[in-house]
Amino acid sequence: MSYSNLKLFALSSNKELAKKVSQTIGIPLGQSTVRQFSDGEIQVNIEESIRGHHVFILQSTSSPVNDNLMEILIMVDALKRASAESVSVVMPYYGYARQDRKARSREPITSKLVANMLEVAGVDRLLTVDLHAAQIQGFFDIPVDHLMGAPLIADYFDRQGLVGDDVVVVSPDHGGVTRARKLAQCLKTPIAIIDKRRSVTKMNTSEVMNIIGNIKGKKCILIDDMIDTAGTICHAADALAEAGATAVYASCTHPVLSGPALDNIQNSAIEKLIVLDTIYLPEERLIDKIEQISIAELIGEAIIRIHEKRPLSPLFEMNKLK
């Protein structure tokens, strides 16, 4: 199939991943510039014709979250006004996903607001990875393709020999049990759960309470969709080590790693943290304990399948490793 009417553009948040995707699918990145006026307003210029093209924009809404989100909205508007046939947003990390419901009175549902903004701007399709809450897909009236990073993480641990009954996959909270179970199925391991109680007065903090499952004398693999300040994952790792785990590894799809995250990880019982490159990490943030693997091949294959109108279901395989 001809790719002459397929365009891939990168905005500011993760140009390194966009370059890898471009190389994977053999399509050069589109020419565009993003700049800010002196008052902080964002201006986007598309420097080539995209009339009649199927355009993909790659941008994670990581820090600075609001600027990166506005870049997407402005770019979509520019593409629509330039007569793109369709506009698909590839958002490896979907920011504001933690605000997916009203947990208390008078709270917003910001992940739904972001969905509304993308649709109003003119987005025809969203391609994303490991949403914080899978039901966010239902906030959209356009197609949402929801990829999973667990097979890539499973492949890494399989190559390290961390499989079988001597290994336990651990969810750091009850909400991540489904994710942990999928990874455990890949690695043929049992699972355990950390029972925690999150503080209602302090943001981004939690208290580990109990371990459900047998981890004594086992190597443990913690898995989460995202790590922000790393408080939860580090407390969980320390609790596992104190309970008799022989080694503790951690993994996540989205390395937000804000605030004291790097110090927390460095000073924790975690031996190695495996993350995907949905969020760009500069070299100075890749400390010895962190290893990053690329999701570019998976995203590239998804883009080609969408363009060729082929099913994405083979990309969701969780029962076998590469």
UniProtKB/Swiss-Prot annotation:
InterPro entries: PRib_PP_synth_CS, Pribosyltran_N, PRibTrfase_dom, PRTase-like, Rib-P_diPkinase, Rib-P_diPkinase_bac. The active site is at residue 196. Pathway: Metabolic intermediate biosynthesis; 5-phospho-alpha-D-ribose 1-diphosphate biosynthesis; 5-phospho-alpha-D-ribose 1-diphosphate from D-ribose 5-phosphate (route I): step 1/1. Its cofactor is Mg(2+). Its EC number is 2.7.6.1. ATP binds at residues 39-41, 98-99. Keywords: ATP-binding, Cytoplasm, Kinase, Magnesium, Metal-binding, Nucleotide biosynthesis, Nucleotide-binding, Transferase. It holds the Pfam family Pribosyl_synth. It is found in: Cytoplasm. GO terms for biological process: 5-phosphoribose 1-diphosphate biosynthetic process; purine nucleotide biosynthetic process; ribonucleoside monophosphate biosynthetic process. Homohexamer. Belongs to the ribose-phosphate pyrophosphokinase family. Class I subfamily. This is Ribose-phosphate pyrophosphokinase 1.
